Amino acid sequence: LLYNVGFLCRRDGTYEMYEKLHVTPDEMKCWGLSGGKTIRTFETDCAKIGVLICYDVEFPDLSRIMASEGMQILFVPFLTDTQNAYSRVQVCAHARAIENECFVVIAGSVGNLPKEHNMDIQYARSGVFTPCDFAFPTDGRRAEATPNTEMILNSDINLNLLNELHTYGSVRNLKDRRSDLYEVRVKR
């Protein structure tokens, strides 16, 4: 089986792998990719993080499960070939930051590979998104790269702001969920 994977590389030299869960019809057709089978978060010396590759971010339950495990930062590496596809990833990633009261970092590929089928054109704009509340940017955009431009994007984030949000936020999406009416759970 062939998977689309992302690697988490830690400063101490250890690493772990995340397999993309939701494979697009095009990825199945062109590359024969299969979807992974594990939803998980990762402990690091900076924060508890989650990884969702591209299309996975369009499924809100995945990040909600990770948030219930204490995720503070969600990383979304992606490769999109059109502005429409990019917009889906960006809008969903921004929504995940608000819904799950976490930081979301998206990092996309840009450029052209004219001789590679299904990789010939890429469009991206990397960014860092936040919840929309008093301690954060009004529009929930901490930093964004120049569209479709190769560059390095740096942004400092303060994890203590998430703790304040969980306690004193004008809305508390995680705390105010009506778990007496519904739940999101993982089938093991």
PLM segments and residue spans:
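CN hydrolase (nitrilase-like) catalytic-core segments centered on the catalytic cysteine
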Residues: 58-150
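A short, polar/charged loop-to-alpha-helix boundary motif
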Residues: 20-33, 150-164
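Short helix-loop capping/hinge motifs at secondary-structure junctions, enriched
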Residues: 13-16, 134-136, 162-164
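A short C-terminal boundary segment appended to hydrolase-like catalytic domains
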Residues: 157-188
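Active-site catalytic loop in hydrolytic enzyme cores
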Residues: 1-69, 82-95, 171
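Short beta-strand scaffold segments in enzyme catalytic cores
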Residues: 4-8, 40-41, 106, 125-128, ...
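Short Gly/Pro-enriched turn/cap motifs at secondary-structure boundaries
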Residues: 30-32, 117-118, 174-177
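Non-catalytic surface loops within mature trypsin-like serine protease
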Residues: 10, 130, 159-161
